């Protein structure tokens, strides 16, 4: 199944890659690769991950303190957030309304 980023989720992902890259380029690459691998797993078996609210599911990265929040749309997976666990857990909820 294909996937798309919500624009704000794409920004979060890019900002996080930049943050880790500034600390260490290899760390930025590792973060990027890990998130891409998690998204790949989501696209292969989207219903396996925990539902956290309504139709929103979450898959947690292993090495970094992030969760990938997504919904299963008709023809694709919509990535709603690339969420660092230190953030307010509800900051992304307005993104559901914009896309439903």
Where are the model-predicted features located?
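Arg/Lys-rich, positively charged N-terminal/basic patches that mediate binding to nucleic acids
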Residues: 1-32
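Enriched for short, Lys/Arg-rich terminal
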Residues: 71-100
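Outer-membrane beta-barrel domain signature
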Residues: 7, 39-44
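Short amphipathic alpha-helical/adjacent loop interface patches that line ligand
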Residues: 13, 17, 35, 39, ...
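Residues that form or immediately flank small-molecule/cofactor binding pockets and catalytic motifs
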Residues: 8, 64, 84-87
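GIY-YIG nuclease signature motif recognition
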Residues: 9, 35, 70
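Basic/aromatic recognition patch in beta-strand/loop cores that engages polyanionic ligands
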Residues: 44-77, 82
């Amino acid at each position: 199944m294909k996937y798309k980023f919500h624009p704000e989720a794409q920004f979060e992902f890019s900002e996080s890659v930049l943050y880790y890259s500034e600390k260490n380029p290899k760390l930025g690459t590792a973060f990027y690769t890990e998130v891409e691998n998690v998204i790949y797993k989501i696209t292969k078996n989207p219903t396996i991950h925990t539902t956290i609210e309504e139709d929103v599911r979450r898959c947690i990265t292993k090495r970094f303190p992030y969760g990938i929040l997504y919904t299963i749309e008709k023809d694709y997976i919509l990535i709603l957030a690339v969420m660092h666990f230190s953030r307010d857990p509800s900051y992304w909820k307005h993104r559901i309304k914009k896309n439903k």
